């Protein structure tokens, strides 16, 4: 947690999020109450490759629930580590604020190269569709990964070794041009000083901000560190608005249980938030929506 200009020492979140496997948070919901974590957790068997979801409760974080993705594959590939060839399996995920789309970097049987980027869409039963390749504008015969889909759901940042770059993996940005999710603008290299002659990736650009965070290796003899970078206007996502609030009793001013639905004027549901105080009596009741500007919305 950042206080002023400095960060507190990191705290181990403990079980059930951390276990004997490699653990990582891939996304955090806008209200900070939901974590999407790597691995498909299982109380009855061994943790497998995949994605799970955990909610913050009065007793801590809930046991991560596996997110179901049709025909999910994550194949391994050979990698040289300290001169030794080993098999590695990589999975990377980015989720839209409304949780309707998951963008992922992984290797499947039909992958163009070493790793590609795919999109999967939430279905009526709550599971997600078979991953759809983002196509040859994004994916090359080499490696693409560490995708980050900005909150506008149109601006995609990703790492690539196949597009022309400065080093051993650069960060690029591309804009989605339609709803097929296969039609994208030509990827633009973010350039120096964001990209270096070494590996760069795992960018995260907070909503309604002019900066981002990247994992970067600045020189051959350095390790990967996290850096904050200023995003030039041409590299930023489309403008967004962050809307927050809290349902309260008009007389007592206390937070009350509620289900809040946000709809665009054409009737499409943008997002729904439930505030259940019977489940968590310490629930502060605050909700948060991230919205494209220039549109009209209705709260119910």
Predicted regions and their residues:
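Short, conserved micro-motifs composed of acidic
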Residues: 1-259, 265-271, 278-300
């Amino acid at each position: 947690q950042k206080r002023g200009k400095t960060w507190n020492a990191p705290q181990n979140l403990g079980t059930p999020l951390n276990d004997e496997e490699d653990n990582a948070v891939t996304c955090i919901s806008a209200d900070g109450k939901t974590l999407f974590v790597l691995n498909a957790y299982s109380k009855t068997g061994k943790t497998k490759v995949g994605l799970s979801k955990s909610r913050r409760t009065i007793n801590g974080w809930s046991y991560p629930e596996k997110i179901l993705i049709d025909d999910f594959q994550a194949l391994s590939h050979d990698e040289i580590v300290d001169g030794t060839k080993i098999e590695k399996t990589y999975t990377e995920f980015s989720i839209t604020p409304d949780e309707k789309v998951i963008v992922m970097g992984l290797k499947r049987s039909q992958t163009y190269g070493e790793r590609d980027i795919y999109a999967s869409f939430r279905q009526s039963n709550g599971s997600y569709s078979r991953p759809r390749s983002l196509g040859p504008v994004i994916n090359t015969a080499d490696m693409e990964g560490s995708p980050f889909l900005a909150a506008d759901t149109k601006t995609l940042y990703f790492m690539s070794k196949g597009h022309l770059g400065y080093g051993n993996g650069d960060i690029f940005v591309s804009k989605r041009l339609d709803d097929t999710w296969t039609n994208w603008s030509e990827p633009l290299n973010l350039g120096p000083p964001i990209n270096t002659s070494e590996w760069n990736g795992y960018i995260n650009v907070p909503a309604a901000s002019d900066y981002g965070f990247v994992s970067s290796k600045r020189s051959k003899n350095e390790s990967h560190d996290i850096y904050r970078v200023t995003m030039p206007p041409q590299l930023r996502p489309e403008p967004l608005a962050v809307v927050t609030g809290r349902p309260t009793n008009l007389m007592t001013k206390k937070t009350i249980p509620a289900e809040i639905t946000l709809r665009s004027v054409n009737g499409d549901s943008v997002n729904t938030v439930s505030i259940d105080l019977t489940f968590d009596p310490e629930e502060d009741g605050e909700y948060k929506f991230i919205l494209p500007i220039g549109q009209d919305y209705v709260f119910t």
